[in-house]
């Protein structure tokens, strides 16, 4: 009986150790899952910020492109107006020079005045045209540089978004694996707990049955001894001896 009780206690301790191991593994898996979920939330926040920044930059690119197109059209229109103005001035000079009057001095003076006006107008127009051209070129260069930097930043954001998307997918995969591991640990823990409870119930039942069997054996032995005592008491010389032996045997069996 002592050996059987020791074996049952050993099996019970083993089952408890297995349960503790599953419990510890389950807690570790839950902690890993919480960490993965926090990382996923942080990565998703970075991706959202990157998408918003990309949208802003794309809007800026669109605005800059429209502004460059507008400046280009304005530049072409101003060139057309300047060319028309220069052409009109030349025509006026030709018309003035084409007059055939007898007053030579007046014609010469008027021609000189118109030549001076035409020269100054042409010089002013050319100067204004050159300044506008330089201003337009500087504006186009400036906006082109801004557009180039914006495109580079968009490309960098696209690469960042791709990297963050890959990290998010990796985090999702890890989270799925952790969820599967947690579910498996829960199933294994429940199975181990159920098995341990079954074994514990079996051990308790076996122990109870052993106690009942022992009690039955003791009663049967006592009945046998009592019947023997009753038979031997008929002989006075041997009655005391039988009583002593029966008490000693019962005491030893109970112990």
Curated annotation (Swiss-Prot):
InterPro entries referenced in this protein's UniProt entry, alphabetically: IF_rod_dom, Keratin_II
Coiled coil (residue ranges): 19-81, 147-227
Listed Pfam families: Filament
Organism superkingdom: Eukaryota
Keywords: Coiled coil, Intermediate filament, Keratin
PROSITE patterns assigned: IF_ROD_2 (PS51842)
GO cellular component terms listed in the entry, alphabetical order: cytosol; extracellular space; keratin filament
Domain IF rod: 1-255
Keyword Cell membrane: no
Key word Transmembrane helix present: no
Self-association state and partner proteins as the record states: Heterotetramer of two type I and two type II keratins.
Alphabetical list of PANTHER family matching this protein: GATA-TYPE DOMAIN-CONTAINING PROTEIN, KERATIN, TYPE II CUTICULAR HB3
Further facts: There are two types of hair/microfibrillar keratin, I (acidic) and II (neutral to basic).
Family statement drawn from the similarity comment of this UniProt entry: Belongs to the intermediate filament family.
Protein name: Putative keratin-87 protein
């Amino acid at each position: 009986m002592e050996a059987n009780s020791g074996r049952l206690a050993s099996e019970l301790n083993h089952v408890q150790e297995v349960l503790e191991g599953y419990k510890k593994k389950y807690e570790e898996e839950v902690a890993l899952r919480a960490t993965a979920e926090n990382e996923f939330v942080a990565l998703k926040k970075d991706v959202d910020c990157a998408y918003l920044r990309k949208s802003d930059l794309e809007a800026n690119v669109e605005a800059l492109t429209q502004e460059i197109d507008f400046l280009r059209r304005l530049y072409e229109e101003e060139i057309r107006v300047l060319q028309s103005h220069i052409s009109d001035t030349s025509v006026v000079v030709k018309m003035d020079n084409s007059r055939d009057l007898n007053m030579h001095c007046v014609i010469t003076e008027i021609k000189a005045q118109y030549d001076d006006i035409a020269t100054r107008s042409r010089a002013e127009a050319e100067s204004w045209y050159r300044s506008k051209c330089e201003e337009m070129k500087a504006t186009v260069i400036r906006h082109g540089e801004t557009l180039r930097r914006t495109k580079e930043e968009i490309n960098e954001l696209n690469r960042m978004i791709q990297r963050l998307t890959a990290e998010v997918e990796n985090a999702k995969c890890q989270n799925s694996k952790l969820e599967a591991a947690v579910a498996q640990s829960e199933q294994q823990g429940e199975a181990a707990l159920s098995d341990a409870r079954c074994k514990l119930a079996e051990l308790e039942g076996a122990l109870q049955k052993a106690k009942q069997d022992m009690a039955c054996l003791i009663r049967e032995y006592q009945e046998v001894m009592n019947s023997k005592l009753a038979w031997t008491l008929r002989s006075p010389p041997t009655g005391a001896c039988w009583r002593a032996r029966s008490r000693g045997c019962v005491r030893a069996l109970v112990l």
